[in-house]
Amino acid sequence: MAEFPASLLILNGKSTDNLPLREAIMLLREEGMTIHVRVTWEKGDAARYVEEARKFGVATVIAGGGDGTINEVSTALIQCEGDDIPALGILPLGTANDFATSVGIPEALDKALKLAIAGDAIAIDMAQVNKQTCFINMATGGFGTRITTETPEKLKAALGSVSYIIHGLMRMDTLQPDRCEIRGENFHWQGDALVIGIGNGRQAGGGQQLCPNALINDGLLQLRIFTGDEILPALVSTLKSDEDNPNIIEGASSWFDIQAPHDITFNLDGEPLSGQNFHIEILPAALRCRLPPDCPLLR
């Protein structure tokens, strides 16, 4: 086997009892690969482990978990200064794994791990909200965000992404669209939004293609607004067809400003952020990520 530089796996604490993962790591170590492993316990651990990875001189920091873990590790990487910043590797171990799925990361642990260590490192974009919080995949607001935020952890653990749909149907009678105004480059819209998707990536909420035209290295954010006065009729309409659907508003820009008369909540790769004013901008070529050669999200 060819020699590969060392890597450090930052593993979400929920995945520590994953026996197949342990076996895959041990097998690669026996083949001569150097793989350090660190386990997160609380917020901030990933940033500390990234600094440790740089001291080790590893070529790759692997995010082992769901979209939230990928977000935390990638955010820590783009905050690094200097040369020789490690690339991001992805090992999908979460409930939905939306970003990993959309970029074509293999489901098989051994294949995903090998890609994370030895795949080509390609410069990709990230997005930043209000000059602080970042996301690598998508910011979603409205009905869908409240569902994913409020869905019980036990339900997600038992049913996976289907749990979001079940919980949404249970809450249908209590949820209303959000009134807001959105501006971007050559874009302006105001009205009642059922769901707002601002994507660097394409899908969220367990496989929902909210921004099907998004690319992760084009310097743009894709916007999709699903409109409607009543939740259920509008939801049925948006699920039918995208073509000439009056309930779907689309736009593309390197930035978007969102204003609302009341607090609305955006889900940034699984992390909620509430407020009335949001400035979301793309950070072009913010980090390098090890991706498959046929990744569909590259231009």
Swiss-Prot record:
GO terms for biological process: phospholipid biosynthetic process. Transmembrane segments: none annotated. Optimum pH is 7.5. Active from pH 5 to 9. Binds 1 Mg(2+) ion per subunit. Ca(2+) may be able to substitute. Gene3D superfamilies: 2.60.200.40, Probable inorganic polyphosphate/atp-NAD kinase, domain 1. InterPro entries: ATP-NAD_kinase_N, Diacylglycerol/lipid_kinase, Diacylglycerol_kinase_cat_dom, Lip_kinase_YegS, Lipid_Phosphate_FormReg, NAD/diacylglycerol_kinase_sf, YegS/DAGK_C. ATP binds at T40, G66, D67, G68, T69, I70, N71, E72, T95. Mg(2+) binds at L215, D218, L220. Its cofactor is Mg(2+); Ca(2+). Its EC number is 2.7.1.-. Its main location: cytoplasm. GO terms for molecular function: ATP binding; lipid kinase activity; magnesium ion binding. Keywords: ATP-binding, Cytoplasm, Kinase, Lipid biosynthesis, Lipid metabolism, Magnesium, Metal-binding, Nucleotide-binding, Phospholipid biosynthesis, Phospholipid metabolism, Transferase. The active site is at E271. Pfam families: DAGK_cat, YegS_C. It is found in: Cytoplasm. It is an enzyme of class 2 (transferase). Residues 2-133 form the DAGKc domain. One of its GO terms (cellular component) is cytoplasm. Monomer. PANTHER family: LIPID KINASE YEGS, SPHINGOSINE KINASE. In vitro phosphorylates phosphatidylglycerol but not diacylglycerol; the in vivo substrate is unknown. This is Lipid kinase YegS. It comes from Escherichia coli (strain K12). The gene is yegS.
